[in-house]
Swiss-Prot record:
This is Myosin regulatory light chain A, smooth adductor muscle. GO terms for cellular component: myosin complex. In molluscan muscle, calcium regulation is associated with myosin rather than with actin. Muscle myosin contains two types of light chains: the catalytic light chain, essential for ATPase activity, and the regulatory light chain, a calcium-binding protein responsible for Ca(2+) dependent binding and Ca(2+) dependent Mg-ATPase activity. SUPFAM superfamilies: EF-hand. It comes from the Eukaryota. GO terms for molecular function: calcium ion binding. Residues 20-55, 89-124 form the EF-hand domain. It comes from Mizuhopecten yessoensis. SMART domains: EFh. Keywords: Calcium, Metal-binding, Motor protein, Muscle protein, Myosin, Repeat. Ca(2+) binds at D33, N35, D37, D44.
């Protein structure tokens, strides 16, 4: 019954994630699913952490697995990670954060300016983090369209004019 519930859970997650990200998540899931039964269980996690040189105790591993409301199949794995990837900020909150730097209200910012802010303020992004963040970002003529970007990362697909 639990496995059936896991199969039904959050199938709309497939519509929310870009195809490339979904493929990367599938590869990650397959690497973790050591026994290839289509579900990640405590033994799969033990083997994965062992291969990384870590040995978390069963309590930690059980806590990780409890984030899923049922057995951890690929759909549930995607759902959990898409929630984590999308974070807790709403699309409007993110858009408003970018808008603070958009004095002329053009809905676009100079991409070099944004990169400079991210490299030198707050979390201090590395060059690799920067490349990954802006890999599929809507940038035209050096201008970063933050309205499209926030819609893209939050999965709404809505773009304001």
């Amino acid at each position: 019954a639990d496995k059936e519930r896991a199969q039904r859970a959050t199938s709309n997650v497939f519509a929310r994630l870009p195809q490339k990200l979904m493929q990367e998540m599938k590869e990650a899931f397959t690497m973790i699913d050591q026994n290839r039964d289509g579900f990640i269980d405590i033994n799969d996690l033990k083997e994965m952490f062992s291969s990384l040189g870590r040995t978390p105790d069963d309590k930690e591993l059980t806590a990780m697995l409890k984030e899923a409301p049922g057995p951890l199949n690929f759909t549930m794995f995607l759902s959990i990670f898409s929630d984590k990837l999308s974070g807790t900020d709403t699309e409007e909150t993110l858009r408003n954060a970018f808008a603070m730097f958009d004095e002329l209200d053009t809905k676009k910012l100079n991409i070099e300016y944004i990169k400079d802010l991210l490299e030198n303020m707050g979390d201090n992004f590395t060059k690799d983090e920067m490349r990954m963040t802006f890999k599929e970002a809507p940038v035209t003529g050096g201008k970063f369209d933050y309205v499209k970007f926030t819609a893209m990362i939050k999965g709404s697909g809505e773009e304001e004019a």
